[in-house]
């Protein structure tokens, strides 16, 4: 065991110094450079550092432990065992107390069972109490979830002897969760515990220097002891992750018995990521050919199929709900439904102790920190990871993948679907994978622009959410923004996940195009090509995934009919809505209707169904209602509202009152024909939301778009959109989008030649004609249009298409009257004799039609329910 103190500064080996911001940022984020950073920080003088190697992590005896003990060690290193040993020794008398803070209810229950099993008695959980306020009498040894800290009485909060924070980085991430209520109070109480408890123990596999430095500020560096262990159990030490370059979805698609109608699209596709080609011309239910099946050899599904037929037990992780159903369907077809356990947000929980009863376990991020499967039951693991704006971040993916502690074959097959990582010019990769190569391995033409993007991101983060000054939230907001905003980049997401896997001593290799090719280490020069292959493959598999999804939905519908699970009729649904007070209130606020039976037309019913299936739709309803209210104002009225909101304190402006009017009461959705209330989470960044929506109102007013009156056949001049967006970007649109949407837009002024080269190299944007995927239209558009497309899609669910019409308007030019033909010629400044006939004017217009193509136009496809909005605003308070 090596023990050293922070007073000495070791010689640098050049490794950390050689890292540029873009190369080092992932390692810094997850504490891979923790020892070097602490030992070279003068402010950490007096801190003690204990490096352990070759054995499970151990803690010093309680009598020799400094007030703050920080333990950084990989998954499977024995952190929980060391904690129990420490607590057993410390809690040697009944008068000593402890509070253990967790990030999830499942983690609390799991830790409670582990304590009981190992003889650590006397602990209660916040779930055991009938009283809301937890008092000293029964809860001096308490396991509590972070959000429930507010239930602890003040007298009890100040008297705990030891605070334990297992999975401390997950606790930190919880401060940014949309489920976090009373953020400032919880932040204050947690910080108070960190300051006042006699002992603090913080543990995690990814403890970073930011956390240790924060604890040193709160308690003094001389009171901090850091234990860093590189030990991992055999289950991780010998594990190898093979990144597949093909999914092979044609294999499960060949097993389905239902065919989707032509043009049916996966619900998972984001509105901001339209299909790469028009699927409406595809034949209904395209046949799966022998060539399609042959092409799956060596793919994700091929490897899974082989192992199932060989009788192996397999666990499968999926980062999306939709794919978890697809892979569970496939495994059930190969084996039997009874052999497969599916765990996702729509299925009941099953204790990990029961997993060994199944040949296949498929799970999503519902299985995360605090839940582990330790038995040597599974031979192989498969993982499907899809980075997307609304999906789990790579830390959540890594945590979920690590729940299975032992694999008999020590092999993990991973496929990354990068079809939703919609990069340049809207988004730019900025992380260079340190596990592939150091700064010197990356060419300067990639390294320099990547560093530039990192520095701009840091500047944008530093100015975001300035009204949140609490210690924990403000200190870790950049980490949170980085983990969320990088989900738009295949390169950045893979680089973060690669760093996390390497942190746990898992070797990562990639498989090439040839099925018989061995997995090889990833090289810098091959990385861009590999990302490009992944994108090509992801798009080519879309039609197969749509086919399987449709089949699963049809089979589920047939099953419900067989077991007589009858949903209400349309008339019964409307009657239930008309009798529901929350539904009537919702109808009045958003649509200006009483909520009577006749008010529930098809667009509103469809909206409520969508809110039941896709929670994001509820936020879009609020956003669109606020935009409609802003667009309904006169020019003078909006000028006053906008100016006042810009200079008012947070929450006090008229515009803030509009937001509160729509957010204060629950919305109502329909789940299987029955009304359910939907609470809109008030997450950190609400100030960013109001600022972003104000900017959108200004853009909408400038281009003439209004939700209730917009004609989908109307064309919008791209030049008008570009001017409006340029003004919004200059006013801070990028910062507002980062605060609320967690998106890091690349501003048009940043798009220099080197930045575009970076996008081409790491953007995974190449397409393959063999799969019917032509060049992306988005690449031909200006960056302002690309940002506009993403904003309107994500905020309002509006699809934006490039108009294919040669001439303005929806009427065929041949059918126009002479005065209309003359108006079109005047518009492009083409002279004509006043005595010209209709035929002559038409011919002259056709000769000059190329002049119209120089002015591209857009079509906005607005959801039908938007036309029902009332644009209501809260009534002004009457003066006494």
Swiss-Prot record:
Domain of life: Viruses
Location(s), subcellular: Host nucleus
Annotated binding of ATP, by residue: 73-80
SMART domains listed in its UniProt record: DEXDc
GO cellular component: host cell nucleus
Domain Helicase ATP-binding per the UniProt entry, residue ranges: 60-225
Keywords of this entry: ATP-binding, DNA replication, DNA-binding, Host nucleus, Nucleotide-binding
An example Gene Ontology molecular-function term: ATP binding
Matches recorded under PROSITE patterns: HELICASE_ATP_BIND_1
GO biological process assignments: DNA replication
Function: Functions as a docking protein to recruit essential components of the viral replication machinery to viral DNA origins. In the presence of the major DNA-binding protein, opens dsDNA leading to a conformational change in the origin that facilitates DNA unwinding and subsequent replication.
Subunit annotation: Homodimer. Interacts with the major DNA-binding protein. Interacts with the DNA helicase/primase complex-associated protein and the polymerase accessory protein.
Protein name as it appears in the record: Replication origin-binding protein
Lineage: Viruses, Duplodnaviria, Heunggongvirae, Peploviricota, Herviviricetes
Name of the gene: UL9
């Amino acid at each position: 065991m090596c023990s050293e103190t922070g007073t000495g500064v070791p010689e640098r080996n050049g490794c950390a110094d050689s890292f540029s911001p873009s190369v080092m940022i992932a390692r810094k984020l997850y504490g891979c450079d923790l020892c070097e950073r602490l030992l070279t920080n003068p402010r950490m003088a007096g801190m003690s550092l204990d490096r352990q190697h070759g054995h499970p992590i151990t803690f010093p005896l309680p009598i020799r432990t400094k007030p703050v003990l920080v333990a950084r060690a990989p998954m499977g290193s024995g952190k929980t065992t060391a904690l129990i040993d420490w607590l057993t020794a410390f809690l040697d008398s009944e008068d000593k107390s402890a509070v253990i803070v967790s990030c999830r209810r499942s983690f609390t229950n799991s830790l409670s069972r582990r304590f009981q099993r190992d003889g650590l008695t006397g602990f209660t959980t916040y779930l055991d109490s009938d009283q809301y306020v937890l008092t000293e009498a029964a809860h001096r040894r308490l396991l509590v979830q972070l959000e429930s800290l507010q239930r602890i009485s003040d007298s009890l909060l100040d008297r705990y002897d030891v605070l334990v924070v297992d999975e401390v980085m997950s606790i930190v991430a919880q401060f940014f969760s949309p489920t976090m209520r009373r953020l400032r109070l919880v932040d204050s109480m947690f910080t108070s515990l960190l300051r006042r408890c006699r002992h603090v123990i913080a543990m995690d596999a990814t403890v970073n220097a930011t956390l240790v430095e924060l604890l040193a500020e709160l308690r003094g560096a001389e009171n901090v002891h850091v234990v860093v262990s590189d030990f991992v159990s055999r289950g991780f030490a010998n594990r190898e992750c093979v990144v597949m370059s093909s999914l092979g979805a044609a294999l499960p698609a060949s097993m389905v018995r239902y065919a989707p109608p032509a043009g049916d699209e996966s619900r998972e596709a984001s509105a901001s990521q339209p299909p790469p080609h028009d699927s409406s011309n595809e034949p209904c239910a395209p046949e799966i050919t022998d060539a399609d099946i042959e092409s799956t050899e060596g793919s994700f599904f091929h490897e899974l199929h082989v192992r199932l037929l060989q009788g192996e037990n397999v666990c499968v992780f999926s980062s999306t709900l939709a794919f978890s159903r697809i892979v569970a369907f496939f495994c059930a077809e190969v084996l039997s439904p009874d052999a497969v356990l599916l765990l996702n947000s729509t299925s009941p929980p099953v204790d990990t102790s029961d997993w060994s009863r199944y040949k296949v376990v498929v799970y999503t991020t519902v299985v995360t920190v605090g839940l582990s499967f330790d038995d040597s039951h599974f031979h192989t693991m498969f993982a499907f990871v899809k980075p997307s704006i609304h999906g789990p971040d790579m830390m959540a993916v890594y945590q979920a993948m690590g729940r299975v502690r032992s694999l008999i074959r020590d092999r993990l097959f991973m496929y990354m679907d990068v079809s939703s990582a919609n990069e340049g010019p809207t988004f730019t990769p900025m992380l260079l994978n340190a596990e592939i190569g150091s700064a010197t391995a990356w060419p300067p033409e990639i390294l320099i622009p990547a560093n530039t993007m990192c520095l701009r991101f840091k500047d944008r983060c530093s100015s975001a959410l300035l009204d949140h000054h609490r210690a924990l939230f403000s200190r870790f907001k950049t980490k949170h923004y980085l983990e969320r905003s990088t989900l738009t980049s295949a390169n950045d997401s893979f680089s973060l996940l690669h760093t996390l896997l390497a942190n746990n001593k898992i070797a990562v290799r990639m498989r090439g195009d040839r099925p018989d090719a061995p997995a090889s280490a990833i090289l810098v020069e091959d990385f861009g090509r590999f990302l490009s292959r992944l994108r090509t493959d992801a798009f080519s598999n879309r039609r197969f995934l749509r086919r399987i999804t449709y089949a699963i939905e049809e089979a589920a519908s047939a099953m419900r009919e067989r077991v007589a699970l009858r949903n209400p009729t349309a008339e019964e649904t409307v009657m239930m809505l008309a009798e529901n007070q929350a539904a009537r209130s919702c109808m009045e606020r958003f649509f200006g209707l009483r909520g009577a039976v006749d008010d529930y037309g098809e667009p509103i019913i469809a909206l409520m169904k969508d809110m039941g299936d896709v929670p994001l739709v509820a936020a879009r309803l609020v956003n669109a209602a606020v935009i409609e209210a802003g667009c309904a104002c006169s020019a003078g009225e909006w000028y006053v509202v906008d100016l006042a909101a810009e200079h008012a304190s947070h929450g006090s402006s008229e515009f803030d009152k509009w937001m509160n009017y729509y957010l204060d009461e629950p919305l109502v959705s329909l789940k299987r024909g029955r009304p359910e209330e939907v609470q809109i989470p008030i997450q950190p960044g609400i100030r960013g939301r109001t600022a972003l929506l104000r900017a959108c109102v200004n853009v909408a007013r400038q281009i003439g778009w209004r939700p209730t009156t917009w004609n989908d056949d109307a064309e919008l001049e791209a030049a008008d959109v570009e001017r409006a967006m340029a003004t919004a970007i200059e006013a801070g649109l990028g910062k507002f989008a980062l605060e609320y949407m967690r998106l890091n837009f690349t501003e048009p002024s940043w798009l220099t030649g080197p930045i575009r080269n970076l996008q081409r190299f790491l953007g995974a944007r190449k397409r393959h004609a063999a799969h019917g995927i032509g060049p992306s239209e988005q690449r031909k558009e200006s960056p302002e249009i690309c940002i506009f497309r993403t904003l309107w899609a994500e905020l309002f669910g509006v699809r934006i298409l490039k108009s294919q019409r040669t001439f303005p308007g929806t009427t065929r030019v041949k059918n126009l009257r002479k005065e209309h033909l003359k108006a079109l010629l005047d518009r492009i400044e083409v002279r004509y004799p006043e005595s010209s006939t209709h035929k002559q004017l038409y011919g002259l217009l056709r000769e000059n039609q190329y002049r119209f193509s120089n002015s591209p136009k857009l079509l906005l496809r607005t959801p039908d329910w938007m036309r029902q909005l009332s644009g209501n605003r809260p009534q002004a308070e009457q003066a006494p």
